[in-house]
Design a protein with these regions (language model features):
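Acidic, polar-rich low-complexity tracts and alpha-helical solenoid repeat scaffolds
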Residues: 1-186
């Protein structure tokens, strides 16, 4: 049953794969592998609660630890467990590939940002390379606001100026903090 599930998984037929993986989750031979793949499929469909439950069941096994570190940091971030996301992200960072390091930097930086630890957020926000090499307005805003909170108004102004042409809440907040930053530099 595991092999059938894996065949469906590699063919990207997750519904059938899940059916077969669920048949072997309690197996001594294939249970942990089935749980890992069920967790991965849940993660890919943004069902982070289920993914986390599956991953927690196999997190003590070395062959999955390295693969799951990034997923668990990301899931905890998306579930609002920011301190846990930071802890997992920091643990995973030295073992990660270059492309994962950028995403982990974003997870750690945004988690610190949400925890209002702006001084700790700054280096990680700066290390983030952006999606396909590009930052979005929220990325610039968070970096600008972290600078603003550190009373580094010159750098805050630089970041806020990158996004004030938008018509959304992020741009409105940027305008407000940009004005505040200019007032505090005079």
């Amino acid at each position: 049953n595991f092999q059938k599930g894996y065949a469906y998984f590699t063919a990207k037929n997750n519904k059938e794969a899940a059916k077969y993986f669920n048949m072997v989750v309690n197996s001594k031979t294939f249970g942990s592998q089935a749980k890992y793949y069920l967790g991965y499929m849940s993660y890919e469909t943004d069902d982070y609660k289920s993914a986390n439950e599956y991953f927690e069941q196999v997190s003590d096994q070395d062959k999955y630890k390295e693969k799951m570190g990034y997923f668990q940091a990301d899931m905890n971030f998306k579930l609002g467990n920011f301190q846990k996301a930071v802890d997992l992200g920091l643990e995973q960072m030295p073992k990660s590939r270059a492309d994962e390091k950028s995403e982990l930097s974003k997870i750690i930086g945004e988690s610190y940002f949400n925890l209002k630890k702006y001084d700790k957020a700054l280096p990680y926000l700066l290390d983030y390379k952006g999606k396909k090499g590009k930052w979005n307005n929220t990325d610039f805003y968070q970096l600008g606001y972290a600078y603003y909170q550190q009373k580094d108004y010159e750098n805050a102004i630089t970041q806020f100026n990158k996004i004030i042409d938008g018509n959304d809440a992020v741009a409105q907040n940027a305008y407000y903090h940009l004005a505040e930053s200019y007032l505090k530099t005079d």
